[in-house]
Design a protein with these regions (language model features):
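Conserved lysine of the Walker
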Residues: 38
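Short glycine-rich substrate-engagement loop in P-loop NTPases that contacts/grips substrate
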Residues: 60-91
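Hydrophobic positions on the alpha1 helix immediately C-terminal to the Walker A/P-loop
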Residues: 41, 45
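Structural recognition of the conserved hydrophobic beta-strand(s) that form the central parallel beta-sheet
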Residues: 97, 122-128, 149
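Interdomain motor-coupling "hinge/lid" segment immediately C-terminal to the ATP-binding subdomain
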Residues: 2, 134-254
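Conserved catalytic cores of phosphodiester-cleaving nucleases, focusing on short active-site segments
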Residues: 352, 372-391, 410
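Accessory nucleic acid-recognition modules appended to NTPase machines
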Residues: 207-371, 376-378
Length: 440
């Protein structure tokens, strides 16, 4: 008998509840990479908040294939969904979930008609490669849908899943004196998260077994599933190039200068040869593209240099598996910092990406050693950020930046405790997301 997957709380549940209660609610599109928990959270949301759930997997349900083939008559569609699922659909009482919606001909386009003619019904759709469908010409119901994006579990959600909600709350409320007294525990949890990452199946395996090797097997299966998606769903002429970019990511991040270099992918490679491959990985939700800015002024977007960027993997646990980092190297403290900087940056990037209300860039200038790992725009604030893998508090670039921009406050994430000194706030790595939540 397979062990039962335990329920793991996700922050996005509150966003789903808010969507349910909106007076101007439209059909919901839930975006996110494969295996981040979209289906799971929608079903749990339905069970908690509705009397009934009508769930259809559009990929493997033959009866659903022609659901929208003839017309968009909502009464007929609702009757058919009810017949397929065995659920008597009632407005306000039933959550309709159409999973893998991109597999249905005209499936996404149908949401326009749900919005215009049946807004009293709660309709939510998801799909493993829905981001690709939306960017590759699939008819998109502009202005007729609400969207949410789901990410791998954050470090805080990892604590919550393991039964340490109080420790999560301390980080979210910035109770740094108490956090400091629990420093050893937080560092242990962080190193475990470095190993496990935030893919729900890997987290659940860790909770069930406490076995690093079992977790790594799950991660390797997820990576293989992503690579199968590339072979199956990517344009045939792009498959080789997508795989080349994908496989180069650990090497790209291991460089001292983590700017994406096409020559690392293939000797003599040029941007125009790989732009579509990179965009495919972004649209699939597998990588985060962080562009460079040359000036730290509001809004950061107008200072973006689209020709210079870094690519980070969607999950630090998967990066560890792709990089073949021995689990013990992630779990145990070490004086050897080889590989730690890139890994820690990827961790921070993932935590930042889960905060949808901030914009993320990095800062550097040609012919200069001054570089900032990240620059964040949160509301009316521009925040320069440096990331340190351990307790090293030297921050030459950060200090030079705040000296150049009077009034600007620097932010450093490291293994050291919370402190404010000389215009720089040091936040422990395990408190990165919780600290930035106070800005949004």
């Amino acid at each position: 008998m397979q062990p039962k997957t335990q329920y793991m709380e996700r922050f996005i549940m509150q966003d789903l509840i808010a969507w349910k209660n909106r007076e101007d609610r439209k059909p919901l599109i839930l975006l996110g990479a494969r295996q981040v928990g979209k289906t799971y959270i929608l079903k749990e949301f339905g069970q908690r908040e509705f009397e009934k759930v009508a769930y259809i997997n559009c990929d493997n349900n033959a009866m659903a294939k022609d659901l929208f083939a003839s017309d968009y008559n909502i009464d007929r569609i609702l009757l058919t969904i009810g017949a397929i699922t065995g659920v008597n659909i009632e407005a306000g009482k039933t959550l309709i979930i159409m999973d893998e919606i991109q597999e249905l001909h005209r499936g996404l386009a149908s949401l326009k008609y749900f919005c215009e003619n049946a807004r009293e019904y709660h309709v939510a759709v998801a799909g493993s490669l829905l981001g690709l469908a939306l960017h590759q010409g699939e008819s998109y119901p502009v202005g007729k849908v609400n969207t949410l994006e789901m990410y791998p579990m954050t470090f805080e959600e990892f604590l919550w899943a393991r039964g340490f909600k109080q420790r999560m709350d301390l980080l979210q409320h910035g109770m740094w004196d108490v956090v400091k007294s629990l420093r050893t525990l937080y560092i242990q949890h962080l190193r475990e998260y470095y190993l496990v990452g935030g893919m729900p199946e890997a987290v659940n395996k860790f909770i069930e077994t406490n076995d690093a090797n079992a977790v790594r097997e799950v991660q390797e299966e997820i990576i293989r599933a992503y690579e199968k998606d590339i072979s199956k769903h990517a344009p045939k002429e792009q498959v080789v190039r997508i795989n080349q970019v994908w496989n180069s990511i650990p090497s790209q991040l291991a460089k001292e200068n983590k700017k994406f270099i096409y020559g690392v992918v293939k000797q003599g490679a040029r941007a125009k040869d790989y732009e579509l491959a990179i965009q495919w990985l972004i649209d699939a939700g597998l990588v985060y593209k962080i562009s460079r800015v040359k000036t730290l002024g509001l809004p950061l977007k107008i200072h973006e240099d689209i020709s210079a960027f870094k690519l980070y993997l969607l999950d630090c646990g998967l990066l560890g598996a792709m990089s073949k980092i021995p689990p013990a190297m992630l779990l145990l403290p070490s004086n050897d910092n080889t590989g730690k900087g890139d890994f820690t940056e990827n961790f921070v990037c993932c935590q930042l990406e889960s905060l949808r209300q901030i914009l993320i860039y990095y800062y550097s200038k040609e012919n200069s050693q001054l570089e900032l790992d990240f620059v964040i725009q949160a509301g009316m604030q521009v925040i320069p950020v440096e990331v340190k893998a351990e307790e090293n508090l030297q921050s030459k670039s950060l200090k030079a930046t705040i000296a150049k921009y009077p009034g600007m406050k620097g932010l450093r994430f490291s293994m050291s405790d919370y402190r404010e000194q000389d215009g720089i706030t040091n936040v422990p790595l395990y408190g990165a997301r919780g600290y930035l939540e106070t800005f949004i």
